[in-house]
From Swiss-Prot:
Keywords tagged on the record: Glutamine amidotransferase, Hydrolase, Lyase, Pyridoxal phosphate
GO molecular function: glutaminase activity; pyridoxal 5'-phosphate synthase (glutamine hydrolysing) activity
Species of provenance: Salinispora arenicola (strain CNS-205)
GO cellular component entries: cytosol; glutaminase complex
Pathway(s) this gene product operates in, as recorded in its UniProt entry: Cofactor biosynthesis; pyridoxal 5'-phosphate biosynthesis
Subunit-structure text: In the presence of PdxS, forms a dodecamer of heterodimers. Only shows activity in the heterodimer.
Family of this protein: Belongs to the glutaminase PdxT/SNO family.
Catalytic residue positions: C81, H180, E182
Gene name as annotated: pdxT
Protein name: Pyridoxal 5'-phosphate synthase subunit PdxT
Amino acid sequence: MTAPVIGVLALQGDVREHTAALAAAGADARPVRRPGELDLVDGLVIPGGESTTISRLADVFELREPIDKRIADGMPVYGSCAGMIMLASEVLDGRPDQRAFAGIEMTVRRNAFGRQVHSFEAPVSVAGIDGGPFHVLFIRAPWVERVGQGVEVLGTVTEGPAAGRIVAVRQGNLLATSFHPELTGDRRLHAYFADLVRAAV
């Protein structure tokens, strides 16, 4: 089976962790910092970090238009935490100068789960992925307030004060989670995305 070539947007955030998780899931993972590097990948991960910084650096490194075009052309993209914000068609509590790639028809609330001191772990079941719930980590994470037609809700928080909040979605070849699977050692979500990329090539 051919390894899909998956880039990790290497402007800020958990680049090394996503790269290692993708490699463990059987992908040929490589950092993407320039448009020429984006041209060489079959799929892209937008990691956690700070969404306003990622937005600004996407412009500085001249990646915004190439990424927008690849998304429009059907390239699979997975965004975790800040990456989810970068894929949202509408962002609540974002900065006025913040611009997303807007691939998924959803409204997300930035930093919905609170500041870093309010970060927490919780079990989340993700539809289509076997093996039981993920034990996931939320760090200043967004949640999804609304999804449009064609957006599949894959996971919600199952317990605690945030129970019922949407934290994993998919629309076509685009996948987004509020949480950080790259930090937990559970590679199932990266394997799921690698399969999605493999099927799209």
